[in-house]
Amino acid sequence: QELNFKVADGKQPFLEAIRGQLQDLTDEKEPISEELLERLLLERRILVIVDRLSEMSEATQAAIRPEMPDFPVNALLVTSRLDEQLGGVTKTTMKPLRIAGNRLSSFMEGYLAQRGKRDLFTDEEFFKACIQLSRMVGDRNITVLLTKLYADQMVAAKEGATDSDLPDNIPELMLYYLNQLNRSVSGQKLSNSTLHEDAITLAWECLKSTFRPAAANRQAAIAALGGDSAESRLKYLEEKLRLIQTKGVGQEQISFSLDPVAEYLAGLHLVEMYDKDQSKWRSFLLKAGAMPGEPAAIKGFLLAVRDCYLAKIPGAKDTDFVPKELKQLGEGSGMAVAAP
């Protein structure tokens, strides 16, 4: 969560956040004393985990400075979508592995076997599905999350839990994922179409400021959804589907549980808004190129938008202006065609 900078004079927001988290974890009536906390941090008796640093505000990132001699934390774990420099301190970096194309079938087979579902498929059906997934991602390495989502859809289709065929592109896979979450809800539920519309709206609310998956103001999100039932619909996505989660000291922010889902849903929002209007797309590309930390910080979103464009615009091709520019910008080579 973001740091709360409205603390008493002389207090450090980072330390105060740690104190608050410890009080919550230990269920104590009073927060731990500053002296004891500082000693525990110094002796590495507390491991501090800063999750999703790359998606936090610049103010919060600036407050986490392990290179400074007075930085209070001696055991720090940071998760980020970027290779954080952290002031040049000595660090150990671990990265999640992606699945190379020649390993896809073995990974998929292992996952389905672990779920006890491999016997649902003949060898022909299984390898056909692997080929289809490889076509969907093209020349990119495949993430574990994407493979899992696709395998789960394979199982759902085979067991009759869905009436649709397997998706043939990643944006459709994300919408299928929403449908499966919705199907698991008992009792009264939102229609799939309403769910898609609301999730796409919330995803854009979370990405529109920085083009990175981040937390959005809860009240602003409710206003974006619109209608008398907006708050209850937001709670449905949070409490029934676990698609979003509430964050912040005052529970005033919401964010998506899975970043790639947020990126693809926000990409669908852009395609719906801009369609084939090149002037709007040029403005978007210019704004994307000027984003702090671009292109690495927003590469996932740019490629998601490209996939959404190719999937949703009739007759769209890789060589068209928009997908070509999105790919080039996402790969860090800037815009090929200057905007007027």
What does each model-identified segment do?
Residues 1-3, 71-74, 85-88, 98-107, ...:
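Extended hydrophobic
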Residues 38, 61-69, 234:
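Short amphipathic alpha-helical segments and helix-helix/interface helices
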Residues 1-39, 43:
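Post-nucleotide-binding-loop coupling segment downstream of the phosphate-binding loop, primarily
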Residues 55, 68-93:
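Sensor-1/coupling segment of RecA-like P-loop NTPase cores
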Residues 38-41, 66, 242-249:
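A short acidic-Thr-Gly-centered motif at the start of a beta-strand
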Residues 250, 269-340:
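Extended amphipathic alpha-helical scaffold segments
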Residues 3-8, 53-57, 85:
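Short acidic, S/G/P-rich loop/turn micro-motifs used as interaction or catalytic elements
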Residues 39-60:
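Conserved P-loop NTPase "ATPase switch" module shared by AAA+ and STAND
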